[in-house]
């Protein structure tokens, strides 16, 4: 059964100003081979990614995949979700806390075994339209090493956000100082 988005949340979604149809004047202009986060849509797009994605801490590989999914949302760097078959769950444990994404639904967090700090999250039963990422995991590049085709991913600013910033992604990005209203 599809998990429907509650009406109160649909109303909140309708209030967004930036939806990816028109790049705002403050957005950087992309050059060849670059992607502007201001061209990403809202609601977010789901895009398969066959590049090699590796997540590790020290020498321990947490995830290694060529079957990731990128979520592309206006104003944010892509968030990369990795299928459960490509995750080394022996290194992970459930972490406390949860959050609600207006597009994807209720997220739960996980941490490294023996630690408490969340390093990533997952949606067990995402809202309709995002079923493709059910039980896929995403990681915070600020807390673990994340790579796309051997390029080290930089974390999105703001602490809470989990966007994956690589050399082809340009902004400015939500989470930077002064971006609270985006």
What label would you give each PLM region?
Residues 1-182:
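Terminal leader/tail segments of proteins
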């Amino acid at each position: 059964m599809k998990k429907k988005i509650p009406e109160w949340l649909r109303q909140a979604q309708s209030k967004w100003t930036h939806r990816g149809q028109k790049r705002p004047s403050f957005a950087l202009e992309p050059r060849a081979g670059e992607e502007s986060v201001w061209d990403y849509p809202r609601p977010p797009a789901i895009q398969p990614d066959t590049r090699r994605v590796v997540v590790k801490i020290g020498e321990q590989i947490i995830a290694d995949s060529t079957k990731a999914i990128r979520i592309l949302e206006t104003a944010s760097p892509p968030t990369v979700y990795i299928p459960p078959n490509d995750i080394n769950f022996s290194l992970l444990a459930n972490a406390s806390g949860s959050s609600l994404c207006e597009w994807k639904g209720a997220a739960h967090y996980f941490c490294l075994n023996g630690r408490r700090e969340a390093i990533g999250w997952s949606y067990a039963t995402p809202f309709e339209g995002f079923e493709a990422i059910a039980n896929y995991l995403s990681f915070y590049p600020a807390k673990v090493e994340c790579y796309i085709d051997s390029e080290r991913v930089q974390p999105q600013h703001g602490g809470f956000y989990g966007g994956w910033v690589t050399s082809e992604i340009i902004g400015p990005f939500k989470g930077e100082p002064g971006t609270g209203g985006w």
